[in-house]
A protein has these predicted regions:
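Active-site/catalytic core of tyrosine-dependent DNA strand-transfer enzymes
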Residues: 137-144, 187, 205-256
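C-terminal secondary-structure termini that scaffold catalytic or DNA-interacting sites
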Residues: 11, 16, 214-224, 231-236, ...
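Basic, Lys/Arg- and aromatic-enriched nucleic-acid-binding interface segment
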Residues: 81-95, 105-172, 176-177, 186, ...
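Catalytic-site neighborhood detector that most strongly recognizes the C-terminal catalytic loop/helix
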Residues: 137, 191-197, 285-315
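Basic/aromatic-enriched alpha-helical hairpins
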Residues: 1, 17-85, 101
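Short, polar N-cap/turn motifs at the start of nucleic acid-interacting alpha helices
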Residues: 182-189, 257, 276-296, 318-328
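Extreme N-terminal basic, low-complexity initiation segments
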Residues: 2-12
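Short basic/aromatic active-site micro-motif
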Residues: 69, 157-158, 256-274
Length: 329
């Protein structure tokens, strides 16, 4: 027998006691990852460039019924994929683990996959260790070249996005998901959707404020139905993949590769030059409290965060030789 029905955004079929995802696991994995690179099948046309795509790390699992997701199969899959792309495989495993947890929360499908499958010892020992790349951080002597190249980008939205990313230390998704309703120009604050606390309020520093005001002046901003600050022509309407713009800027500035997460890392590192208290930096960046006192006894007001955040911004701009905050693209 076959029973079909919608579960969230996903169509599932119950086939002889096993769950098979229509479109396989693809739709759910895409919803979780916001990117097709993990589940792309081989032979599909590339969205950028020419030629067919290579299979994503999850592609070999997409056609399996869930009942076949056993520790042995997952361990074998990890063993194969980790050989050529360990970091991407580790991320794909985390997406798969999230999928398994989701499936086990649905009453209709509980018991089809063992809930502790992803925690099996033989599976866990095959998961590649993700380590941050050495040097994935801007040095203070590189700031002038970086800002010059980023501000020269033809796309003002990508240019502003990259600068805001560096000057707030926020996660890339937190900044790309900003709506204009999250920006308070009157009280100089930004509301950020935080994966740790749900949301956090951080200062809207002077230079970042000017950057965002300049985006409001871009023509056709009214066509942005979702009210995204950093809009694009993508299906979601917001900026999704700014890496290409950043890579062009790095090439122009003759700087080594720095990831978008490296810009977040740069904020935390550069803040040490101004001797910002560690707890202040952590609260601005949205890190978990690392000590008992931080967790239970520190409730810093926005003005205190602003005092230090503006010092960091001013120091970075001075090192970048940007003397006038209004002097920008």
């Amino acid at each position: 027998f076959i029973v079909g029905g919608p579960v969230g955004d996903f169509e599932l079929l119950l086939c002889h006691g096993t769950v098979c995802v229509v479109g396989k696991m693809r739709d759910l994995i895409l919803q979780l990852s916001k990117s097709s690179i993990y589940s792309t099948k081989p032979g599909e046309s590339k969205k950028r460039g020419r030629g067919p795509t290579s299979p994503g790390p999850l592609a070999s699992l997409l056609d399996r019924p869930l009942s076949e997701l056993t520790p042995e199969n997952i361990a074998e899959w990890l063993s194969t994929e980790r050989q050529n792309r360990p970091t991407v495989t580790a991320h794909a495993y985390r997406l798969l683990r999230a999928f398994i947890k989701w499936a086990n929360y649905q009453k209709k499908y509980q018991g089809i996959i063992h809930g502790d499958l992803a925690q099996d010892h033989n599976v866990r020992k095959m998961v590649p260790i993700s380590a941050s790349k050495a040097g994935d951080c801007l040095q203070k002597e590189q700031l002038k070249s970086w800002f010059s190249a980023v501000r020269s980008l033809n796309n003002p939205i990508a240019s502003a996005y990259l600068q805001v990313l560096l000057l707030t230390g926020a996660r890339r998704e937190e900044i790309s998901s900003l709506r204009w309703s999250d920006i308070d120009f009157k009280w100089s604050s930004m509301r950020i959707k935080d994966k740790i606390e749900g949301e956090r309020i951080i200062p809207l520093t002077p230079y970042v404020s000017d950057l965002l005001r300049s985006l409001m002046e871009i023509p056709n901003r009214g066509t942005n139905e979702e009210n995204w600050v950093f809009r694009s022509n993508s299906k979601s309407g917001k900026i999704i993949e700014p890496c290409s713009a950043h890579n062009r800027a790095l090439t122009r500035a003759e700087l080594p590769h720095i990831s978008l997460h490296g810009l977040r890392r740069s904020f935390g590192t550069l803040a040490e030059w101004v001797e910002v208290p560690t707890g202040i930096v952590a609260q601005i960046m949205g890190h978990k409290p690392s000590a008992l006192a931080e967790k239970h006894y520190r409730r810093r007001p926005l003005d205190l965060l602003r005092k230090w955040h503006e010092k960091v911004e001013l120091w970075i701009l001075e090192e970048a030789k940007i003397k006038n905050n209004v002097d920008k693209r």
